[in-house]
């Protein structure tokens, strides 16, 4: 399944993997997974984290290595995000709940994820998704952006 990914996708997933793999040892533990999920505003229990890891932990060693992570991402991409998941993600970004994602909100989330973006990079992301040109991302634009990746 992971063999259907492009080199660009694999490179992106490698970057994402290293955001999760805080100590850089090549594996993601429940602790590391929990840290990332909490930075996204989720609050998973230890049992939920363990379930998530068990789901993709092919060799049963209790952690996720990069090949296992790739398999998980390839699977996730196949069953494209449901409308509900996209709405949940939108709500995470839309901190003040006004129905729009501003540059400040986008910057805040990306920084929490460990992505240190310049103002230019954040503005570029907004520009790419901002179809009506109002300088922020509404739900419809967010859905289009999520579906096109």
Curated annotation (Swiss-Prot):
Binding residue positions for Ca(2+) 2: 57, 59, 61, 63, 68
GO MF terms held by the record: calcium ion binding
Binding site for Ca(2+) 3: 94, 96, 98, 105
Location of N-acetylalanine modifications: 2
Record key words, sorted: Acetylation, Calcium, Metal-binding, Repeat
UniProt key word Metal-binding: yes
Residues reported to bind Ca(2+) 1: 21, 23, 25, 27, 32
GO annotation, cellular component aspect: myosin II complex
Other remarks in the entry: This protein has four functional calcium-binding sites.
Family: Belongs to the calmodulin family.
Protein's UniProt name: Calmodulin
Underlying gene: CMD1
């Amino acid at each position: 399944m992971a063999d259907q990914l492009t080199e660009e996708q694999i490179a992106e997933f490698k970057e994402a993997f290293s955001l999760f793999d805080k100590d850089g040892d090549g594996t993601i533990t429940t602790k590391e997974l929990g840290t990332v999920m909490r930075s996204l505003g989720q609050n998973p229990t230890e049992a939920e984290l363990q379930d998530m890891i068990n789901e993709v932990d092919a060799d049963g060693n209790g952690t996720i290595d990069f090949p296992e992570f790739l398999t998980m991402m390839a699977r996730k991409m196949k069953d494209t995000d449901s409308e509900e998941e996209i709405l949940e993600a939108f709500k995470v970004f839309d901190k003040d709940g006004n129905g729009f994602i501003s540059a400040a909100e986008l910057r805040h989330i990306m920084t929490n994820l460990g992505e240190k973006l310049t103002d230019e990079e954040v503005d570029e992301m907004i520009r790419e998704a901002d179809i009506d040109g109002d300088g922020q991302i509404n739900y419809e634009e967010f859905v289009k952006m999520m579906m096109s990746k």
